[in-house]
Structures are given as structure tokens and as C-alpha cells.
Amino acid sequence: MARCCFYTAGTLSLLLLVTSVTLLVARVFQKAVDQTIEKNMVLQNGTKVFDSWEKPPLPVYIQFYFFNVTNPEEILQGEIPLLEEVGPYTYRELRNKANVQFGENGTTISAVTNKAYIFERNQSVGDPTVDLIRTINIPLLTVVEMAQQPFLREIIEAMLKAYQQTLFVTHTVHELLWGYKDEVLSLVHIFRPDVSPNFGLFYERNGTNDGEYVFLTGEDNYLNFTKIVEWNGKTSLDWWTTDTCNMINGTDGDSFHPLISKDETLYIFPSDFCRSVYITFSSFENVEGLPAFRYKVPAEILANSSENAGFCIPEGNCMDAGVLNVSICKNGAPIIMSFPHFYQADEKFVSAIKGMRPNKEEHESFVDINPLTGIILRGAKRFQINTYVKKLDDFVETGNIRTMVFPVMYLNESVLIDKETASQLKSVINTTLIVTNIPYIIMALGVFFGLIFTWLACRGQGSTDEGTADERAPLIRT
């Protein structure tokens, strides 16, 4: 009986250890899990993946921070602007896909993303319909830019004198965000119907969408899950000066493909930034008990480099690191984009304004992604809207102002997975962990039987050494 147990334990130990090593080397269970995820992460009507894509379950909040001008007269005399940050004014962002249509072969799907904003008073510093902000007059600067066209110059100069426009204006937060009717723009609209008589930083963005997208469903390849192939009927942009800079790359930032490696670069096309950007791995994170890869927008995105030369408008007119001239896609308004407080920008932009305090924790854009599923667990998209301003002798409204990039406001669009969704995702991940760890369980059993085999071997050896009483007796007795 003991001999039988001895050989059984040894055989089982050897078989289990060989099997576990074979399974680990061949990655049998890992491949099975990966293939299951790849198969399920496809946009198909009636699936949970499709429902979550069409109506994202995670709450999204957008916080607006304005820079209130405290020394307007001194600025016009050539002094450094002193700005005071006012905010946040927080809105709940409701988003859903609409006009959804599948392509004939099931590999593409078209949709628009409707967004609506609901004010959250308990998360805000005040009432946007009451609170006043003094800021730079962007409509005025826009009209001044139009005056570079000879046939409009005299008309615009006359209008500015007649309406006594000033470089700094005061409006409510609500007006600055969602729009107000501007006197000068209303007059320009008569000559240029394409110019709206209304101005707002997010005018016509509440309850609307930014155009139709065509996405890949992931049917042909999981790496193509929700990747954009067309926006507003175009497969590429036409604002920039090189084909590379005009490319529409990646997803819209709401989702990513599963099975992400920290060595890969992910691409996003945020239409409000007027260009594609990429994000790179930064660190390992844990969100509500779930593992995550943190990806961030690197400083190279807005670097003054040869790779970004195609974003210089006019061609060759490149600004210093940390800012992007997007006037070409903002109806001619002299809008300059940057990260909040000129984070990661050239020091000259920071020192030109009193009140800029850039820091990583509050001003960096990032996204925490579960690498197994590609699901976003936490994220923050942060960027700042500025305007370019300089003294113009023909326009007294500009006074003796310094040439500078002038901050107007910045936003923080954030998302965080809720506990219920995190719990559901955690159960899925735990199940996959059990499956992928089966080889290790088999190996542990092999080690266990190996220990039994060793114990039996040692016990048997001890019994042999000790022997019976007769065996221990001397051969010759006297």
C-alpha cells in the first residue's frame, strides 16, 4: 500500500508539473481569455458593449474656470495683466449616440454624439446667470482680424468708432459660455452672412453635436474598436499644412480597444482641439480596486518641433512650445489653445501674466484605462482657451497693450467610474484571473504531490535504515 502511494504521488507530481509548464509556455488559458474578449468587444446591436457605447453609463462633469481681469486700464497702458481665477462652474454632461446606422458589412457604424449640460449648483462657486466676469473682447479681436481684408477695413473702423467698443467687456458666466448677441458681429453679419451675430465660447454646443462620425466596430480586428475613419464626411482634416497633421487618428476618447499594452501609444481625435493627439503610458494606478494604466498627454504634443511644423498657421509661423493657434478652425477668431495656466508651455507665456500657477496635479490631462477591457475608469481632459492680442496703431481700442497670449478660461472635463459599475467589472476581471491562473493552480497541486512523494521517500528510507530486531542481531551468537 505504501509503495503504491509512493509511486502514485511521484507520477501525479511529475504529470501536473509538466502539464502546468506546458500550459504556461503555450499560454493556452491566456489565449482563450484574450480570444473571448476580442470576440465580445465588438459594436453589435443588442449587446452590453453596444449599449454602453450608445449611452455611456459613467457620469461626466465639466468644470469651467474663468480669468477675471482686475487691472484693465493698466493693461492698456502696457502693464502686465493681473488675472484672478474664478470657478468652478460645474455642469453635468449628458451624452448619447444618435442617428446610429450600421454599415453594410458590419465593420463600420455611423453616429452623432449629442451633448447637453445641466448646471450643478452644489458643485459650483456661484450662479452663472448672475456672476460677472471681466474679460478680453474676443468679438472685437475677431472683427479686427477681419479688417485685414481691404474691402472690410473702412467699414469695420467706422463701426468700432460708432459703437465705442472697448478691449475689455463684462458679461455673465452664462453669456460667455452659451452666447449673447454682439453689436459689432451683428453689423458684420449684414456683410458676411457666414459670421454669426452671436458669440459664446460654447455657443450652440448645448443640446447639439459636433457632426457625424463613422467608426470601426472592431468586427475585423479588435484593435480597430471604435476607431474613427470619417468625420463630417471627411477622412482627413484640411486646416493644417501637412498630410500627417491633417490625419484623423484613433477614437473620440470615449472608449479604447481591449488588451492594451503599456508599450503602445493611443490616439484620440478631440474635435474641439481641431487635431488628433496621442497619449503615452505614465504609471500604474488603482481605481476602485481595479488595475489601470494611466495615459497622459505628453509635452511633445504642443512642442515647438519639426513634427509639429504642419500646425503652424500661416505656414512657417510657429509659436513657442505649449500653445496652438486654432483660429483657422474657429471661424477666424484669434483663439490659441494651451493646457491650463500654460502648463508645460514656454516660461515666457507664464511670466507674461500675473496669476498663472501651472501644476501637474490640477492641470495635466490623463486617462486611467483598465488594460484588459479598455474601459475608462477615470479621466480628465483639461485645456485652456486664450486669445492672441497685440497693439494695432490703426485701432485705438488696443491702446499700448503688450503682444501676448491672453488667457480667457479653462475647463476640466472629468469622469470617474461609480462603485456599482466598478463592482460589476471587478467580478468579470476576477473570473478571467481565475481562468488564467489555472496553470498555476495545477503547478501548486504538482508541488503538493511532490512534497508527499518526498515525504514518502524519506519515510521509506528511514524504515529501511532502522530494520527489524532480527536484522539488527549479530550474525554469530555466543
Curated annotation (Swiss-Prot):
Annotated stretches, region: Important for interaction with GBA1: 155-191
Organism domain of life: Eukaryota
A GO term, aspect molecular function: cargo receptor activity
Record's keyword terms, sorted: Disulfide bond, Glycoprotein, Lipoprotein, Lysosome, Membrane, Palmitate, Receptor, Transmembrane, Transmembrane helix
GO cellular component: endocytic vesicle membrane; lysosomal lumen; lysosomal membrane; plasma membrane
Record PTM text: Acylated by palmitic acid group(s).
Subcellular location as annotated: Lysosome membrane
Topology, Lumenal side: 28-433
GO biological process, one term: sensory perception of sound
Glycosylation sites: 45, 68, 105, 122, 206, 224, 249, 304, 325, 412, 430
Transmembrane segments: 5-27, 434-459
Membrane topology according to the record: Multi-pass membrane protein
Disulfide bonds: 274-329, 312-318
Keyword Nucleotide-binding: no
Function text: Acts as a lysosomal receptor for glucosylceramidase (GBA1) targeting.
Family per similarity comment: Belongs to the CD36 family.
Subunit structure: Interacts with GBA1.
PANTHER family, per the entry: LYSOSOME MEMBRANE PROTEIN 2 (PTHR11923:SF51), SCAVENGER RECEPTOR CLASS B TYPE-1 SR-B1 (PTHR11923)
Name listed for the protein in its UniProt record: Lysosome membrane protein 2
Organism expressing this protein natively: Rattus norvegicus
Lineage of producing organism: Eukaryota, Metazoa, Chordata, Craniata, Vertebrata
